[in-house]
Amino acid sequence: MRVAIAGYGDLTRYICEEFVKAGHVLVILTRSYKPQLESQGVAQAITDYSPSSLRAPLADCEVLISTISDISSAYTNVHRNLILACQESPRCKRFIPAEFVADIEAYPDEPGFYYAPHEPIREMLRGQTDLEWTLVCIGWLSDYFVPSKNRHIKDIGEFHPMNWAGNKIVIPGTGNEPVDFTWARDVVRGLASLIEAPRGSWEPYTFMSGERSCWNDATRLAVQKYRPGIPIQHVSLHSVAGMIKTAKDENTEVLADYYLLSISQACAIPTDKVEAHREKYFSGVTFRSLRDGLCQVDEHPDSIL
């Protein structure tokens, strides 16, 4: 199957590996030439994401997946053009926008900084019938718990409880709130399987998970393996409310939104829906637990999980 991928970021690096293994043919939509794609034998199309510049690359693709993550209005503008281009395309009638976070079916406004740029695109998809689409929900990526040499996913500093650069762990809430964790490579393998599902079989929301856990348990595993003695603290809901009241910059507001994302339990992916979608879409995909991935690092210390 010929698949277009909008954006060449961290997740796309896994896509270039796993989709090719699955037998799919890729074309990466990118604003600038990426020489590394040439060495992988992956096609690329230079675009400014205007509908006219997307017309030719999408003409012979069957599916478009966006990995463009942005918390500004640029996300809305680019994704609106991606939808319009798919509607004009004679073949590309399936679209997966860049979501890949929480249970946005139950918590559409989590994380808070996602809502304003993302919700107009969700509404645009709901209001049309030309394209088949789905919003993919995965919880948190497990990859942040391993050293950077073992992942394509970049560090996000204090926005993740395990702050490698800061050498500290800051856990929102009690740390016992349920959170689902999924490895990025498994998400991509799931996407490669999802696009092979029969036309008309996609649901508005698709759920994936490697395991249900919580921040206390997940960080305990990582601390034992990588950072014994690293300082650990918890941030209460009351403290987060205070952060929001006194925030003087966007970074503090975004950090508070990340804290609320965990405290609200929005990253607990519905177990019944995870199981239903494993049976419906992902019967050939193995979703690894956090411990599974850490064991793989032991066996292959220089591998990208």
UniProtKB/Swiss-Prot annotation:
Its EC number is 1.5.3.7. It comes from the Eukaryota. Oxidoreductase; part of the gene cluster that mediates the biosynthesis of swainsonine (SW), a cytotoxic fungal alkaloid and a potential cancer therapy drug. Swainsonine production occurs via a multibranched pathway and is dispensable for fungal colonization of plants and infection of insect hosts. The first step of swainsonine biosynthesis is the production of the precursor pipecolic acid (PA) via conversion of L-lysine (Lys) to 1-piperideine-6-carboxylate (P6C) by the aminotransferase swnA, the latter being further reduced to PA by the reductase swnR. InterPro entries: NAD(P)-bd_dom, NAD(P)-bd_dom_sf, NmrA/Isoflavone_reductase-like. It comes from Metarhizium robertsii (strain ARSEF 23 / ATCC MYA-3075) (Metarhizium anisopliae (strain ARSEF 23)). It catalyses: L-pipecolate + O2 = L-1-piperideine-6-carboxylate + H2O2 + H(+). Belongs to the NmrA-type oxidoreductase family. Isoflavone reductase subfamily. Disruption phenotype: Does not affect the production of swainsonine. The keyword Secreted does not apply. This is Oxidoreductase swnR. Pathway: Mycotoxin biosynthesis. The keyword NADP applies. Keywords: NADP, Oxidoreductase. GO terms for molecular function: L-pipecolate oxidase activity.
